[in-house]
């Protein structure tokens, strides 16, 4: 359908984990509730909370003790991952009744393209129907954005919560989108916003009118792309397989001489981990899986991998995983070449860290991880965050992030 505009929905479940808990236990409805691990410990933190709790000042990442001080009647429940995965599967099943073009973004949000379906002539009514079904059949509230592309649909869904439906047309951008602070633009995190502000850009409208050369000099190829988005230009299609796309960032190093010296080999890994980390950060992506390569003096090559429980782009996390693999699989013979590769990459904006609720204080001291944690929770408050442990599932084929990984693997099998 050349020349025909697309009709894209972005479906975002409202306070998903808390909403699932209320659906499971009706006695919680209308009450201030929060999902947090280790609820009996003062150092437990809030993962997400109901709108009733938010109205009392409770926020994501807030320690339980502080939340209780603000809202003494706050009901705190532990997370139930199986329950959330089950509800998510049901949610996506409903969406697929309207179109095959459903792209999961995370366990609680996704895109739909209804352009070439019978529903295209009644987009708003279709959104109302979807929202009503999610509420009636699953007892889960949602917000839906309707727009001609994915970026605008995402921005639209954020405009009315909970239970909002918003249509955002390109002609409305000057009045609706451009006055917003640059920090509220999807795809722009705290660090990127700080950089952009050095150009005198404070609003999305400023970015839309910004100097493309200056943006490219500052942000690389991402600069012009962000300007395009600010102008409502985003050609990316809804792709049901996008979550499974395979990408990688890696480096290897050939030693000047064959070596079996642990300290020397550790030094090589240290440099490789730094290189991979810097490349991941430049690309603003994180790796969900890590491979190492060991080539011995006789040219025998061994490759081993592990799935990371949390996406990683920091040198220490990459180094920790690489050395764990090396320690387990090195046969003590002289080595000629070593390599590290991060795979199954996800954009930082979509990297959901699973919360280690027992070590939050330690995690919170870690920069820049703490900054990113705040950023992710501000934009995706319903997601769990945990500092970078690893799951020892060598040769596993799972993809995705945190417990979302299990969900997306199930989705792929359907």
Swiss-Prot record:
Enzyme superclass (EC): transferase
GO biological process assignments: DNA-templated DNA replication; error-prone translesion synthesis; SOS response
Catalytic activity entry: DNA(n) + a 2'-deoxyribonucleoside 5'-triphosphate = DNA(n+1) + diphosphate
Amino acids binding Mg(2+): 12, 108
Region (Disordered): 394-414
Keyword DNA repair listed: yes
Gene Ontology cellular-component annotations: cytosol
The organism's place on the tree of life at top rank: Bacteria
EC numbers on record: 2.7.7.7
Record-annotated site: Substrate discrimination: 17
InterPro entries: DNA/RNA_pol_sf, DNA_pol_Y-fam_lit_finger_sf, DNA_pol_Y-fam_little_finger, DNA_polymerase-Y, DNApol_IV, PolY_HhH_motif, Rev_trsase/Diguanyl_cyclase, UmuC
Function, as annotated: Poorly processive, error-prone DNA polymerase involved in untargeted mutagenesis. Copies undamaged DNA at stalled replication forks, which arise in vivo from mismatched or misaligned primer ends. These misaligned primers can be extended by PolIV. Exhibits no 3'-5' exonuclease (proofreading) activity. May be involved in translesional synthesis, in conjunction with the beta clamp from PolIII.
Name this polypeptide is given: DNA polymerase IV
Species per Swiss-Prot/TrEMBL record: Bacillus velezensis (strain DSM 23117 / BGSC 10A6 / LMG 26770 / FZB42)
């Amino acid at each position: 359908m050349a020349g025909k505009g697309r009709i894209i929905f972005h479906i975002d479940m409202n306070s998903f984990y808390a909403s699932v808990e209320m659906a499971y236990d009706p006695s919680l409805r209308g009450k201030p509730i929060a999902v947090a691990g280790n609820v009996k410990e003062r150092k437990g933190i809030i993962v997400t909370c109901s709108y009733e709790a938010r109205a009392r000042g409770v926020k994501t990442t807030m320690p339980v003790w502080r939340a209780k001080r603000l809202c003494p009647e706050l009901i705190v429940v532990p997370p139930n991952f199986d329950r959330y995965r089950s509800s998510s599967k049901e949610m996506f099943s409903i969406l697929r009744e309207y179109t095959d073009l459903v792209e999961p973004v995370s366990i609680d949000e996704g895109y739909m393209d209804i352009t070439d379906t019978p529903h295209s002539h009644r987009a708003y009514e279709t959104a109302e129907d979807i929202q009503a079904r999610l509420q009636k059949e699953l007892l889960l509230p949602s917000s839906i954005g309707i727009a001609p592309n994915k970026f605008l649909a995402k921005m639209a869904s954020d405009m009315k919560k909970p239970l909002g439906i918003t249509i955002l047309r390109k002609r409305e951008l000057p009045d609706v989108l451009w006055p917003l602070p640059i920090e509220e633009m999807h795809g722009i995190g705290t660090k990127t916003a700080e950089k952009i502000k050095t150009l005198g850009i404070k609003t999305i409208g400023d970015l839309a009118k910004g100097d493309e050369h200056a943006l490219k000099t500052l942000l690389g190829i991402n600069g012009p792309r962000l300007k395009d988005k600010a102008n409502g230009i985003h050609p990316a299609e809804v792709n049901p397989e996008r979550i499974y796309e395979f990408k990688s960032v890696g480096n290897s190093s050939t030693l000047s001489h064959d070596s079996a010296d642990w300290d020397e080999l550790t030094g090589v890994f240290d440099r490789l981990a730094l290189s991979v980390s810097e490349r991941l950060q430049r690309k603003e992506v994180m790796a969900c899986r890590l491979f190492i390569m060991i080539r011995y003096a006789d040219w025998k090559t061994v490759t081993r991998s592990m799935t990371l429980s949390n996406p990683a782009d920091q040198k220490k996390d990459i180094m920790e995983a690489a050395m764990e693999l090396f320690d387990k699989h090195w046969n003590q013979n002289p080595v000629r070449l070593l390599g590290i590769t991060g795979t199954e990459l996800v954009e930082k904006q979509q990297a959901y860290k699973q919360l280690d609720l027992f070590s939050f204080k330690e995690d919170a001291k870690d920069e820049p991880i703490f900054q990113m944690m705040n950023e992710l929770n501000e934009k995706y408050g319903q997601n769990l965050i945990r500092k970078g442990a690893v799951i020892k599932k060598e040769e596993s084929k799972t993809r995705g992030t945190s417990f979302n990984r299990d969900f997306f693997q199930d989705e792929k099998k359907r």
